[in-house]
């Protein structure tokens, strides 16, 4: 059974994927900044059949210890088969109301953290014969989305880095899956950064009516097992990805009409 490390594992997509891998008998390393919620997910995974579960707490707003975190995750079971870099934070502010500090925080958590982990694990993965890195991007990383300027920027950046990584390391046994969710019913909007850096504190209507995390996890875990380069996760909102590709002008007009909160 695979050894799997999931960041952002205390709720939503990360927790649902952890439970799905647990049902396969996987060995799991789970990371989040919330000890209580993470321990709850770990207990659920053990009950659902995980061979072993290790919990590693980490706050991705401070990356000074991230190399040590990656080393601990790797050493937990003597190597990792799958790394799912899922931790992230969103926002609900206009460009004018988004401070540079807020943008930097989102870039640290959403972009630099997964980049740093991937870089730390590349050499041991290659030496071991390969491995699989999945990373959560977003539909907001495929086109500009109102009230998401910093969030969209961080997710656009993930595409550039991880597509490059795949091109460079494919022949050395590294596989990359870009996980692109649309509206999934998680707490991402509740914990999103609002004006002044405070929590948004409520579920967006679109988010609340989105796909369940369990359905999303089923799609994601299957895509990783098939080494899919990219997997779109959601419902009709994913049409915007294809509209952007084939009708960019129409996509821009539709984006201006989106009311995300």
What kind of region is each of these model predictions?
Residues 10-11:
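Conserved glycine-rich cofactor-binding loop
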Residues 24-41:
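Conserved glycine-rich Rossmann-like NAD(P)H-binding loop of the short-chain dehydrogenase/reductase
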Residues 94-95, 99-104:
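Substrate-binding pocket helix/loop in short-chain dehydrogenase/reductase
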Residues 138:
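Residue(s) in the substrate-gating loop at a strand-loop-helix junction
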């Amino acid at each position: 059974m695979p050894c799997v490390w999931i960041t952002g594992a205390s709720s939503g997509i990360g927790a649902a994927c952890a439970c799905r891998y647990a049902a396969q008998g996987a060995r799991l390393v789970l990371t989040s900044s919330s000890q209580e919620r993470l321990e709850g997910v770990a207990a659920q995974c053990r009950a659902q059949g995980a061979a072993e579960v290790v919990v590693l707490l980490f706050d991705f707003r401070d990356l000074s210890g991230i190399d040590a975190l990656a080393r601990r995750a790797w050493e937990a079971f003597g190597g990792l088969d799958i790394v799912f870099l899922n931790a992230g934070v969103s926002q609900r502010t206009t460009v004018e109301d988004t401070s540079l500090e807020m943008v930097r925080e989102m870039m640290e958590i959403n972009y630099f953290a997964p980049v740093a982990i991937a870089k730390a694990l590349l050499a041991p993965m290659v030496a071991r014969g390969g491995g699989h890195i999945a990373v959560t991007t977003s539909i907001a990383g495929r086109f500009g989305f109102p009230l998401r300027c910093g969030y969209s920027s961080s997710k656009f950046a993930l595409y550039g880095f991880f597509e490059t990584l795949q091109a460079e390391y494919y022949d050395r046994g590294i596989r990359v899956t870009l996980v692109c969710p649309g509206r999934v019913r998680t707490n991402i909007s509740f914990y999103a950064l609002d004006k002044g850096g405070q929590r948004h504190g409520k579920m967006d209507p679109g988010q609340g009516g989105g796909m369940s995390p369990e359905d999303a996890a089923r799609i994601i875990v299957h895509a990783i097992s098939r080494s899919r380069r990219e997997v779109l996760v959601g419902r009709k909102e994913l049409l915007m990805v294809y509209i952007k590709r084939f009708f960019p002008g129409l996509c821009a007009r539709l984006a201006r009409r989106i009311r995300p909160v």
